From Swiss-Prot:
Gene that produces this protein: Htr5b
Low complexity composition bias: residue spans: 20-36
Name the UniProt record assigns to this protein: 5-hydroxytryptamine receptor 5B
Species of the source: Mus musculus
Glycosylation: residue positions: 5
Family designation: Belongs to the G-protein coupled receptor 1 family.
Lineage: Eukaryota, Metazoa, Chordata, Craniata, Vertebrata
């Protein structure tokens, strides 16, 4: 998915790095698991400081919480028939990718952080499997966020044309494209010989460092979906601003002699008559739709904001480092890597917090189990 570290072969997060030399790295001065030092030193007992224990504990809790929360969302969607439709299929696709991140990617990344000298000691085959799943799952998670944003955008701006049938077809197509594109980016090095992930001499496991693949993977996995979600939110903002202006123009001044008249209950139009009074034409259906659209727009905004904050430090670093032949301190690389992983924890929190049906389903699920 990226140039050097999405495989998790980042220098250790949970400890101050040992002495490094730029000559240890065969390419851009980055030592990926080839330098000594770290949490566990060869031939020595691991120096488990309080800081090390704290950070490792937090990372283990993050992995467990990411897995359990996304699994809860998946179980709820499977068991509640009302969720067997859009947009919950997009939510389920996101939860699947995030569960796989928690199960297949984050644990081995933590093992790599703790390994002696940050070396990959699990063999070439497992290295390729790990990196392939890393790129596949993280890319799918990112593109699923873009798919949810697109679905909300079309629902808000084209609710008449975006019928249930159209929405079902569009969501199924977006899910298929998401996983197909993610698989292409993940498997391209293996299918087309686009660089090598495993270095047996240095015991190093990392995403292919081929410059052309670096550009292809970072753009396909992050910068393209980033452009999509930013464009979508800009359009949602414009649509909301337009509707707010239209509502203000719908407020009509009434003369002082105007009398109030109650509309039929179906439309629930309310007329108020006072001196210098106004009348607002708004049906209960319009009000309900506007509230729903407002919640959807807020959810999309928070989802996009968290997505950008979690991933942009990592991908900016991975784009700039090869161009300037420079490198951040190892501790920052690890922080940016795990910040990106944490997006898989925040995703289910965000899209369930804005849907009361999920909260009710969670309560019902646990009540039945008792």
């Amino acid at each position: 998915m990226e140039v050097s570290n999405l495989s998790g072969a980042t220098p250790g997060l949970a400890f101050p790095p040992g002495p490094e030399s730029c000559s240890d790295s065969p390419s851009s001065g980055r030592s990926m698991g080839s330098t000594p030092g770290g949490l566990i030193l060869p031939g020595r007992e691991p120096p488990f400081s309080a800081f090390t224990v704290l950070v490792v504990t937090l990372l283990v809790l993050l992995i467990a919480a990411t897995f359990l929360w996304n699994l809860l969302v998946l179980v709820t969607i499977l068991r509640v028939r009302a969720f067997h439709r859009v947009p919950h299929n997009l939510v389920a696709s996101t939860a699947v990718s995030d569960v796989l991140v928690a199960v297949l990617v984050m644990p081995l990344s933590l093992v790599s952080e703790l390994s002696a000298g940050r070396r990959w000691q699990l063999g070439r085959s497992l290295c390729h499997v790990w990196i392939s799943f890393d790129v596949l799952c993280c890319t799918a998670s990112i593109w699923n966020v873009a798919a949810i944003a697109l679905d909300r955008y079309w629902t808000i701006t084209r609710h008449l044309q975006y019928t249930l049938r159209t929405r079902s077809r569009a969501s199924a197509l977006m899910i298929a494209i998401t996983w197909a594109l993610s698989a292409l980016i993940a498997l391209a090095p293996l299918l087309f010989g686009w660089g090598e992930a495993y270095d047996a001499r240095l015991q190093r496991c990392q995403v292919s460092q081929e410059p052309s693949y670096a550009v292809f993977s970072t753009c396909g996995a992050f910068y393209l979906p980033l452009a999509v979600v930013l464009f979508v939110y800009w359009k949602i903002y414009k649509a909301a601003k337009f509707r707010f202006g239209r509502r203000r123009r719908a407020v009509v001044p009434l003369p002082a002699t105007t009398q109030a008249k109650e509309a039929p209950p179906e439309s629930e139009m309310v007329f108020t008559a006072r001196r210098r009074a106004t009348v607002t034409f708004q049906t209960s259906g319009d009000s309900w739709r506007e509230q729903k659209e407002k919640r959807a727009a807020m959810m999309v905004g928070i989802l996009i904001g968290v997505f950008v904050l979690c991933w942009i430090p990592f991908f900016l670093t991975e784009l700039i480092s090869p161009l300037c032949a420079c490198s951040l301190p190892p501790i920052w690389k690890s922080i940016f890597l795990w910040l990106g992983y944490s997006n898989s924890f925040f995703n289910p929190l965000i899209y369930t917090a804005f849907n009361k049906n999920y909260n009710n389903a969670f309560k019902s699920l646990f009540t039945k189990q008792r």
